[in-house]
Amino acid sequence: MATFVSELEAAKKNLSEALGDNVKQYWANLKLWFKQKISKEEFDLEAHRLLTQDNVHSHNDFLLAILTRCQILVSTPEGAGSLPWTGGSAAKPGKPKGKKKLSSVRQKFDHRFQPQNPLSGAQQFVAKDPQDDDDLKLCSHTMMLPTRGQLEGRMIVTAYEHGLDNVTEEAVSAVVYAVENHLKDILTSVVSRRKAYRVRDGHFKYAFGSNVTPQPYLKNSVVAYNNLVEGPPAFPAPCASQNPASHPHTDDAEQQAAFLLACSGDTLPASLPPVNMYDLFEALQVHREVIPTHTVYALNIERIIMKLWHPNHEELQQDKVHRQRLAAKEGLLLC
């Protein structure tokens, strides 16, 4: 096994020396061929273009070394699953002695290339219940955030593509927190377009969908909402690290809440339907800073547009007729 590994490394080294500055283009073409984005003929043409006529053999030697390495890795131990070989190994009576040399060559050939049973390398088929399938699934299928293991696997693949060897735990933790905060920003932008909210410190949004809404026809309502002192109630014995002046007293907080309730409207806001793709599309158009990368933003906007749907006039008419039939049927049942 070590011999084949050394042969592969030697073939790779010879190929890199023959390619010179074109080695990156060769590895890119090799990756495209592995991903089945280009055919074997196209890959050979590109390799011949990058190599000179005297160094084309290094390309073939490298591919043969890879195939030999793969065959050694997937092959079964010697003698296991092999078919019996009955021809050519034993000398037949009546033949001249001059055939002994051919017999020795055949023995070496048989020792190097032994026939194998094709079914010995086939994967055993085991029927699985679809409910018990534990294969990795995309987040769009599970409707859940990616786990730490899924993120780490994706980061390892990306690291290998960029020439890195490994991914640290600190990097995985940073990506996990980044995904959570990114989704929180998107949800905040969507909800802030649908519901009223308050602002603390000039930028922090909170109290989404509060039932206490200001009355626009009262002058005091605007003053009351602009003069809010936000913060938790004061503690009886504040700690040394806390500033008592920054927290309102309990009586002041109760008076402020009663004043806001008196200045609010007498009707509650109408209930809204669930969030749909139109709400997400509008929120991303208004809050462009949520997805700062233009490539990611454009790709997701295209996906959202492809999923947008609304009923046409014929579907609305059919829905109206269906509702009338249901109403008539319920009326007959009541009678």
UniProtKB/Swiss-Prot annotation:
<dbReference type="GO" id="GO:0000124">
    <property type="term" value="C:SAGA complex"/>
</dbReference>
<dbReference type="GO" id="GO:0005634">
    <property type="term" value="C:nucleus"/>
</dbReference>
<keyword id="KW-0805">Transcription regulation</keyword>
<comment type="similarity">
    <text>Belongs to the TADA1 family.</text>
</comment>
<comment type="subunit">
    <text>Component of the STAGA transcription coactivator-HAT complex, at least composed of SUPT3H, GCN5L2, TAF5L, TAF6L, SUPT7L, TADA3L, TAD1L, TAF10, TAF12, TRRAP and TAF9.</text>
</comment>
<protein>
    <recommendedName>
        <fullName>Transcriptional adapter 1</fullName>
    </recommendedName>
</protein>
<keyword id="KW-0539">Nucleus</keyword>
<dbReference type="Pfam" id="PF12767">
    <property type="entry name" value="SAGA-Tad1"/>
</dbReference>
<dbReference type="GO" id="GO:0006357">
    <property type="term" value="P:regulation of transcription by RNA polymerase II"/>
</dbReference>
<dbReference type="InterPro" id="IPR024738">
    <property type="entry name" value="Hfi1/Tada1"/>
</dbReference>
<comment type="function">
    <text>Probably involved in transcriptional regulation.</text>
</comment>
<dbReference type="GO" id="GO:0003713">
    <property type="term" value="F:transcription coactivator activity"/>
</dbReference>
<keyword id="KW-0804">Transcription</keyword>
